[in-house]
Amino acid sequence: IREELGVNSYTAPSIQLLFKELNALKPIPFEKVWRDLPDSTPQDRARLALSIGAVIADGFLTVTAEKQSGIEPIGRVLLRLAKGLGVGDHVTKHSRSIIEKAARKEWGDIRKELIRSQAEVEAALLGLKDEEMAHLVALGGWLRGLEITTSIVHESYTPARASRLIQPELMNYFLDRVSTLNPKFKKTKLGTALEKNLREIKRITTKPVNTAVEPDEVTRVRELVREINALVSGGEE
């Protein structure tokens, strides 16, 4: 069904790829890259899908940093958002398992539950023939992941660390997906910022081989992705 609806291998793995990036960027200044989890449920499906992906990315950050106190809130918020999108039944068991495993500090198992949560949400959306929302879950995770990684690199810059921000395949993939989004959504403040800022991020991070992203460019990418994520969590239409 994934092939049939045009969802290729980047959709499901995209958020869990953040684990590789975070492990490469350790030690993680957790308090400086953490954010308050969303305390409300967006009313529109696009922001809901993006929010689910972002919270899964927050979960990966918390697992990588082994912050036990942060796991239970993530499990509860993830379930609330999934219910808002109409796929709560597919996440309930994973949310419960995440909370139970956090009490035992079973980090590897929590990671697996987060990965399964995205897969279940994606499968449910594809079952509803809602390919667009499945892509937005993946995009939401990637955007939050980019905010986290640019913040870590900004905190302790080296050219090698900054080189991890160059992801041309993912950039092209998500820009292609954004170009096909519902025209009504693309006219919203979030939709406009999403396309405009992603194109600017691509411009900044498109580099010749062995050319680093400079410190001021890291700062600019962080600003651009933060603007998008603030619109996702802040509710501005």
Located regions from the model:
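Extended amphipathic alpha-helical interaction segments
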Residues: 101-187
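Exposed alpha-helical structural elements
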Residues: 17, 29, 70, 77, ...
